[in-house]
Amino acid sequence: SIALYRPSVAVLNNIALDHKSMEELRTLFAAFLSRARTSVLNLDNAETRRLAETLALPDMLTYSLEDPGAAFRASDVVSAPDGMSCIVAERATGEQARVCVQTPGRHNLSNALAAIAAARACGVSLREAAQALMGFVGIRRRLEVVGSARDIVVIDDFAHNPDKIAATLSTLHQFPGRLLVMWQPHGYG
């Protein structure tokens, strides 16, 4: 359970209704972050931003696709059905690196920024972290192309709460053509 983790580097991408009430989630994640040596937080998620603004964390790195005040910020974002690219700037050093990921969707680019910030917290250079991400092709059941025939592409994604479903649908709307979506309802909360 996350309640027992004592990480050196804690990454918090977002807080959204999933398995517990929002208040329980806020408390759970605040405690998780407070046990870490370094915390990495996404300023593009309102709940995570609130924690970044209210918690007195010893060493905090932030990232964002939008907020110029973040420690790691993306600019010149390019979206394509087969991936994303951007320039990542590290505010503390002024250093920049091009990041290319082979997974589509702004949420995946945000995950890449989180990975870069965590790598920097561990002493990896910005350029090395960006280079390492170029080899990441995604994981099973996350916008995974499972087949195609006659110009029809079948994609499997295990989005299982409203925020994740919205992110997946937003990404799929970047693909050309019509969408036919099937959803298997699962409980959450």
Language model region names:
Residues 41-44, 158, 185-186:
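Structural motif
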Residues 154-160:
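Switch II (G3) loop of P-loop NTPases
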